[in-house]
């Protein structure tokens, strides 16, 4: 009982505002009355929750007033209820979590086992003929080793035409070159060569062999003795050759004639680095 007057004197001494000090005094009286009437010998245990903190006398006094209305029996009963709630709640969620975790894992395993365990392995384990016979997959080359049928080489859509272009070049320029009479102009042949170059330059650097073959054929045609130095340019040669460049019908100017005469020199075709590009650009400039 000695601690109560000390707290009382402290609160009176620390109180700055009269309203809060009166409320604190009333709260102390009520708390002492309730503690004396309902509890015997537990005053020291019931008093610490209502001790005012010295740092903030006003607010702690206000909260002390609010807390002093709760009786100790209610406080202990709520404490006990909270303990029961925590113990029962903690024991039940653990059990629920264990059962829920098992049920969730079981459900997930059942759901995952159906699409991934039952349906996908049959799709991956049939024979290669039934698996790769779908139209969405690219066609397969024959296995490189006849004794080992498991080596399959995939072939992309853009790779299908590259070996064909290497093994079998475009027959149209060769037929046109063979079918042309000896009186046709060199410009038409160069033009057909430029068209083949324009077609072959799209394949990339892997087709340098095919381009070099067409160039060698043009060089051989240049050195044939049956070509006139300044022949007339008939319009039938432009119609018979299938080329990508549009034909220009009309007389040639002297500048264009000089450019065309420079085409007879095989020096641009023997360049090592830019022979493809120089030949195609000179043919276009001649046009």
From Swiss-Prot:
Residues 10-32 form the OCA domain. Pfam families: POU2AF2. It comes from the Eukaryota. Disruption phenotype: Mutant mice generated by CRISPR-Cas9-mediated gene editing are born at normal Mendelian ratios, and have indistinguishable weight, morphology, fertility, and organ histology from normal mice. However, tuft cells in the trachea, small intestine, urethra, gall bladder, tongue, and nasal epithelium are indetectable in Pou2af2-/- mice, whereas a partial loss of tuft cells is observed in the colon. Residues 24-51, 161-199, 247-279 are annotated as: Disordered. In the N-terminus possesses a conserved OCA domain for bivalent binding to class II POU domain-containing transcription factors and to an octamer DNA motif (5'-ATGAAAT-3'). This is POU domain class 2-associating factor 2. The lineage of its organism: Eukaryota, Metazoa, Chordata, Craniata, Vertebrata.
């Amino acid at each position: 009982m000695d601690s109560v007057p000390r707290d009382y004197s402290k609160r009176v001494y620390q109180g700055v505002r009269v309203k809060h000090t009166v409320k604190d005094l009333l709260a102390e009286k009520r708390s002492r009355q309730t503690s004396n009437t309902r509890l015997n010998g537990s005053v020291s245990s019931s008093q610490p929750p209502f001790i005012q903190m010295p740092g903030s006398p006003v607010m702690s006094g206000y909260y002390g007033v609010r807390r002093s209305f709760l009786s100790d029996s209610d406080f202990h009963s709520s404490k006990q209820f909270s303990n029961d709630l925590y113990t029962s709640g903690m024991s039940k969620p653990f059990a629920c979590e264990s059962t829920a975790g098992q049920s969730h894992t079981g459900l997930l395993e059942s759901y995952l086992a159906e699409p991934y365990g039952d349906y996908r392995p049959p799709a991956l384990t049939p024979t290669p003929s039934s698996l790769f016979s779908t139209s969405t997959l690219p066609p397969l080359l024959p296995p490189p080793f006849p004794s080992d049928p498991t080596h399959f080489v995939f072939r992309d859509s853009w790779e299908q035409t590259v070996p064909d272009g290497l093994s079998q070049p475009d027959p149209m320029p060769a037929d046109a070159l063979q079918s042309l009479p000896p009186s046709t102009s060199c410009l038409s042949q160069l033009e057909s060569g430029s068209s083949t170059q324009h077609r072959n330059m799209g394949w990339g650097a892997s087709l340098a062999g095919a381009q070099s073959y067409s160039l060698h054929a043009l060089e051989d045609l240049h050195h044939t003795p049956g070509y006139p130095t300044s022949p007339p340019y008939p319009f039938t040669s432009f119609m018979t050759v299938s080329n990508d460049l549009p034909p220009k019908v009309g007389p040639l100017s002297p500048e264009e004639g000089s450019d065309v005469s420079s085409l007879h020199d095989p020096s641009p075709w023997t360049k090592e680095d830019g022979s493809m590009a120089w030949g195609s650009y000179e043919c276009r400039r001649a046009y």
